UniProtKB/Swiss-Prot annotation:
Pfam families: DegT_DnrJ_EryC1 (PF01041). It is an enzyme of class 2 (transferase). Pathway: Nucleotide-sugar biosynthesis; UDP-4-deoxy-4-formamido-beta-L-arabinose biosynthesis; UDP-4-deoxy-4-formamido-beta-L-arabinose from UDP-alpha-D-glucuronate: step 2/3; Bacterial outer membrane biogenesis; lipopolysaccharide biosynthesis. It catalyses: UDP-4-amino-4-deoxy-beta-L-arabinose + 2-oxoglutarate = UDP-beta-L-threo-pentopyranos-4-ulose + L-glutamate. Belongs to the DegT/DnrJ/EryC1 family. ArnB subfamily. Keywords: Aminotransferase, Antibiotic resistance, Lipid A biosynthesis, Lipid biosynthesis, Lipid metabolism, Lipopolysaccharide biosynthesis, Pyridoxal phosphate, Transferase. Induction: Induced by BasR. It comes from Salmonella typhimurium (strain LT2 / SGSC1412 / ATCC 700720). Its EC number is 2.6.1.87. This is UDP-4-amino-4-deoxy-L-arabinose--oxoglutarate aminotransferase. Catalyzes the conversion of UDP-4-keto-arabinose (UDP-Ara4O) to UDP-4-amino-4-deoxy-L-arabinose (UDP-L-Ara4N). The modified arabinose is attached to lipid A and is required for resistance to polymyxin and cationic antimicrobial peptides. GO terms for molecular function: pyridoxal phosphate binding; transaminase activity; UDP-4-amino-4-deoxy-L-arabinose aminotransferase.
Length: 385
């Protein structure tokens, strides 16, 4: 009984905000008899284009899948180099490596954890075939400067927007400048358990993505049924099985309709955290100086032992004993075993400093005032205040 009560009282780092709308959306798809990729995918893609201002959107089974086929569509392969921050989820690095290319990991700004144009430019070589900036924690990277580099050197930019549904940069939603990849993973601002979407204004690129995500065929099963096309399509080039079922797409659509309200609640909680941190030794990330709207996917603090009297890992363990979950976004990719052994001499000082200290606090739309007070009380207790 005691263990069951402890689990029921546990405050997770994140929890999806699901309700009657999502249940109704799933029922509609189940009742339709078409549960795999179909009309709900088309609705989701159109709705996401309205959000970002792009001409094309391609729904996929995950943002990782989207990154894989986006790199393939650019022709990334053996001997090519792709610039990315090490402060990112390892899936980006994995996709680069699996295509035979070389990831070129660069440092980030110490206080925003954003990749900087200076670090990107210093890493450009004749072999550089793509730049992947990360919109970190819900804030945007400095796109004007990054796209200027891409244009100057003739290098495509693929925006990692997994954290950035609802994020804007200088008045435009992330993705509006070119190509961006969003995530619908369970902890993201909108979710359908697993899924993602790639936005672009390039019709040829979008066509390649659609083919690569579905076996290399020119059409999917719904296209063949609804469009009266030949029952057997031809393989244009070898592809993958990365399509998103309509069950997932319907949930994502229901979530997308709530995006403004969900993100407003996230922003309100983040503002409370910022106010509370004024009396605590833990350091939140700094906000970018350029005009933006923050989606507040994560609220991250840095736990420096010299300043706080406790290590990050000890803080996370202590919060867990108090029934409070936390996250680590991210352990720097170049410190992971495979990449540590592949790049043994790589040092990225600001990335490494943060990788040892960052901690994501609970932040989700259904978080209550009581939940918030519980986190802050625990942090005061741990800090000895």
């Amino acid at each position: 009984m005691a263990e069951g009560k402890m689990m029921s009282d546990f405050l997770p780092f994140s929890r999806p905000a699901m309700g009657a709308e999502e249940l109704a959306a799933v029922k509609t798809v189940l009742d339709s008899g078409w549960i795999t990729t179909g009309p709900k995918n088309q609705e989701l893609e159109a709705a996401f284009c309205r959000l970002t201002g792009n001409q094309y959107a391609v729904a996929v089974s995950s943002a990782t899948a989207g990154m894989h086929i986006a790199l393939m569509a650019l022709g990334i392969g053996e001997g090519d180099e792709v610039i990315t921050p090490s402060m990112t989820w390892v899936s980006t690095l994995n996709m680069i490596v699996l295509l035979g290319a070389n990831p070129v990991m660069v440092d980030v700004d110490r206080d925003t954890l954003m990749v900087t144009p200076e670090h990107i430019e210093a890493a450009i070589t004749p072999q550089t075939k793509a730049i992947i900036p990360v919109h970190y924690a819900g804030a945007p990277a400095d796109l004007d400067a990054i796209y200027a580099l891409g244009e100057r050197y003739g290098i495509p930019v693929i925006e990692d927007a997994a954290h950035a549904t609802g994020t804007s940069y200088k008045g435009r939603h992330i993705g509006a400048r070119g190509t961006a990849i969003f995530s619908f993973h369970a902890i993201k601002n909108i979710t359908c358990a697993e899924g993602g979407i790639v936005v672009t204004d390039n019709p040829q690129f979008a066509d390649k993505l659609r083919s690569l995500k579905f076996h290399g065929l020119g059409v999917d099963a719904w296209d063949r049924q609804s469009g009266g096309r030949a029952p057997q399509a031809e393989v244009l080039a070898p592809g993958y099985k990365y399509n998103l079922p309509d069950l997932n797409a319907a949930i994502a659509l229901a979530q997308l309709q709530k995006l403004d309200a969900l993100n407003a609640r996230r922003a309100a909680i983040a503002a409370q955290y910022h106010q509370a941190m004024a009396d605590l030794p833990f350091q939140p990330l700094s906000l970018p100086s350029w005009e933006h709207i923050h989606a507040w996917h994560l609220f991250i603090i840095r736990v420096d032992e010299a300043r706080c009297g406790i290590t990050r890992d000890a803080l996370m363990a202590s919060l867990k004993t108090k029934g409070i979950g936390t996250g680590l976004h991210f352990r720097a990719a170049h410190t992971q075993k495979y990449y540590r052994e592949r790049f043994p001499t790589l040092t990225l000082p600001d990335t490494e400093w943060n990788s040892e200290r960052i901690c994501s606090l609970p932040l989700f739309p259904d978080m209550t005032e009581s939940d918030f007070d519980r986190v802050i009380t625990a942090l005061h207790q741990i800090a000895g205040q």
